Design a protein with these regions (language model features):
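Beta-sheet-dominated scaffold domains
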Residues: 1-2, 8-9, 16-25, 32-38, ...
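Blade/loop signatures of beta-propeller domains
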Residues: 43-59, 94-100
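Helix-loop-helix junctions within predominantly alpha-helical proteins
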Residues: 66-67
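Catalytic phosphate/metal-binding cores of nucleic-acid and nucleotide-processing enzymes, i.e., regions
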Residues: 63
């Protein structure tokens, strides 16, 4: 099963066929990640929800919790090792599968730095890089978001008129991993 979220729509691709995977009575998702057999969703109101284990079509309306360490908008969820990371506009929360019912995950840790652009989040060398709410590029190192951008990149981010539209691309070449971000009229 492959899960896709775009424009508030959740689609499951299975056997080459795409089918809607969301109940219209539930709050539309803004992103999806995979962890421990669950597809995990972010919702703009700060909720995190998930499917049944190993079943992208099974969604329990009570299987949710709130990323609420900070009263910010939930921007994106991503899976990283045994964690689901909930990127808020001003915070990041680590959630771990504890087998709870109906919601399987429990908050494990949180930091007070957020994500300015959901499309900037990318897996890089077994961690996540992203554009932070202070308009710098950061890489997670354990539970710390380490600044990796130089002043030229910081200036490009500060001058971007639509920070939320920044997107990232990663690739590997000759043993090196690259992370590039693109704004309205620039790429670094």
């Amino acid at each position: 099963q492959i899960a896709v979220v775009c424009g508030g729509q959740y689609v499951v691709i299975e056997g080459g066929v795409a089918r809607p995977g969301w109940d219209d009575d539930l709050i539309p998702p803004t992103s999806v990640a995979f962890s421990d057999g669950y597809f995990v969703f972010s919702h703009e109101d700060g909720r995190i929800s998930h499917t049944g284990n190993d079943d992208a079509h099974s969604i329990d309306g009570l299987a949710y919790s709130a990323a609420e360490i900070s009263p910010d908008k939930l921007v994106r969820v991503m899976g990283l090792q045994q964690y689901v990371l909930a990127f808020g506009a001003r915070s990041i929360e680590w959630w771990v599968d504890v087998g709870g019912d109906p919601f399987a995950f429990q908050r494990d840790f949180a930091i007070q730095i957020g994500c300015a652009a959901s499309g900037s989040c990318a897996l890089v060398n077994q961690t996540i890089a992203f554009v932070a709410d202070d308009l710098t590029v950061r890489v997670l190192n354990g539970h710390e978001a380490v600044k990796v951008s130089n002043l030229a990149v910081d200036r490009a981010l500060a001058s971007e008129g639509d920070v939320a539209s920044i997107v990232a691309k990663t690739w590997r070449s000759r043993g090196h991993i690259f992370y590039a971000i693109s704004g309205t009229d620039w790429t670094w």
